[in-house]
């Protein structure tokens, strides 16, 4: 009888968890995480001092270099890229608050999922006590 009672509560808890998981907007989360990843990578390049440069010279590798190859294939930007930084700052001012709200919402949803999981585990394992016949 106890097993059926626990099974019913466990099933109800599992249904609640499954409903929350289905109602979650997975695409929105993926887009947010992708945008954050791109933002972190872009800011990381700016902070580390790396610039967008492509060089035709391969001095540090062990490949054979043809001396006839023209050296005009070098493209390097030595000047700071102010326009992309200005654009990024403007975009951050506009969208950072929205990202923060989405992240806070994600944290609240994860906390709720943890509470649901704790409830489900309590419902599933809560009635089992050492004096039950299963433990003898």
UniProtKB/Swiss-Prot annotation:
Topological domains, Extracellular: 53-136
Membrane-spanning residues: 32-52
Name this polypeptide is given: Small integral membrane protein 23
Biological source species: Mus musculus
Cytoplasmic-facing ranges: 1-31
Coiled coil: 92-124
Main location: membrane
Bilayer topology term: Single-pass membrane protein
Example of a GO cellular component annotation carried by this entry: membrane
Pfam families per UniProt: DUF4635
